[in-house]
Amino acid sequence: MDFITNSPEETEAVGAALGKILKPGTILAYRGDLGAGKTAFTRGLARGLGYCEPVTSPTYTIVNEYLGGRLPLFHFDMYRLASSDDLWDIGWEDYLERGGICAVEWSENVDDAMENAVYITIHKTGEECRRIEIEGGIDLADLSL
């Protein structure tokens, strides 16, 4: 399913709507160029899961954990990882077993570990306009914006 957004706030709104319907253990594999809006989408996702705290890119920490919402949110940035072999060094399997949502930026760097993932592809179509594709392994019938 595709969504067209015209501002970062609208991109966040799509993320928030998705956050309200996700089930425990969901892996979201983000794809998109630098500056496409992956972190903005995750800010909305966190809001949809019930978080009020600021959401920032985990570029330097590799993973940011948000606990205390409807489900735990683990926000990963795989930009600096060379391959999925590096995932095991950061405890990927432990995160999967915790029953939260794993939101993975730069998932293409670890694509072979994204089994059963929901793919979120964000295309930059203008300065603030985006086309967001959501595909695979999720029923979007209950998604309401």
Please give the residue ranges for each predicted region.
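N-terminal pre-Walker A segment at the start of P-loop NTPase domains
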Residues: 1-17
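The conserved Walker
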Residues: 34
